[in-house]
Amino acid sequence: IDAYLSQTPHHYTTGDGGYRDSDGYLYVMGRTDDVINVAGHRISTGSIEAVVASHPVVAECAVIGVRDDIKGQLPRAFVVVKSGIEIDAERVAAEIKESVRKRIGAIASVKDVVIVPALPKTRSGKILRKTMRGIADGRDEPTPATIEDPSVLVAIAPLLQAPIE
């Protein structure tokens, strides 16, 4: 129990990552113990997601580690834009990358920001990150029985498999 109470005085460390928006609402994005290994550094995808999600046009996001021959894994962000907002995808991607670099550090730099219409989720609303990682790594992932809308996974599979730019 000391490990959960000793990191920040008067606060309990849950291991969840998130952010507070400008209206004061708290969003829990996921576990900070979901880590990727980038050039020998263990980086929390939840921490990266919290920064990505704080961008004003982002409705939701998922960050996964994709295989890289040199660094082991590279962070790749999949972003759903808030409805009704027209964006310049390249500008938004550059802003997200810069924000992650400034707030977490260069080692956590998102190498690719992919704008998607939706993220694959379970019926209870959890993003299917493990399935996304498997497809990105070239594995033949079965469609989970708990998936809310299988067409979302079919639609983004080519984007998951695309090489990092």
State what each model feature region is.
Residues 2, 64-68, 118:
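Short, solvent-exposed loop/turn elements at beta->coil junctions and helix N-caps
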Residues 4-5, 9-12, 113:
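Short solvent-exposed loop/turn micro-motifs enriched in small/polar/acidic residues
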Residues 10, 15-108, 124-127, 131-134, ...:
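AMP-binding/adenylate-forming catalytic core of the ANL superfamily
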Residues 1-5, 17-18:
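AMP-binding/adenylate-forming core of the ANL superfamily
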Residues 113-123:
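Short proline/glycine- and acidic-rich turn/helix-capping motifs at secondary-structure junctions
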Residues 157-165:
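A cross-taxonomic marker for long C-terminal extensions/tails that follow the last structured domain
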